[in-house]
Amino acid sequence: MESRATAKFMRVSPRKARLVAQNVNGLPVEDAMNILKFTPNKPADIIFGVLRSALANAEQLPGIDVDAMVVKQIVINEGPTWKRFLPRAQGRATKIRKRTSHITVILAEGQE
């Protein structure tokens, strides 16, 4: 049985979030939460919250052993990009792209 949680329009670059997601993909939930808790960057905090939400969703399903849950997959998709302009010299402007991510965590019952 699977459990999933999604966070959309998160203000973190998909490229940076994928680096963190690769570290915990396929691990037991307890190990993944420990790694994310002590990883000192913004994507780790966001993925940690989505992982907790997926675990809470799994507790609502009947007949699921929450202690045996494994991170089956973490999907980081690109969300819309917010465009801003930074004024520069002589009337010019530079485009700033603030990237967003859609983060999905899928948990499954598995053998450790």
UniProtKB/Swiss-Prot annotation:
Keyword terms: Ribonucleoprotein, Ribosomal protein, RNA-binding, rRNA-binding
Family: Belongs to the universal ribosomal protein uL22 family.
One biological process term in Gene Ontology: translation
PANTHER family found in the cross-reference section: CHLOROPLAST 50S RIBOSOMAL PROTEIN L22-RELATED (PTHR13501), LARGE RIBOSOMAL SUBUNIT PROTEIN UL22M (PTHR13501:SF8)
Purpose: This protein binds specifically to 23S rRNA; its binding is stimulated by other ribosomal proteins, e.g. L4, L17, and L20. It is important during the early stages of 50S assembly. It makes multiple contacts with different domains of the 23S rRNA in the assembled 50S subunit and ribosome.
GO MF annotations, alphabetized: rRNA binding; structural constituent of ribosome
Gene Ontology CC: cytosolic large ribosomal subunit
Annotated protein name in UniProt: Large ribosomal subunit protein uL22
Quaternary structure and interacting proteins, as annotated: Part of the 50S ribosomal subunit.
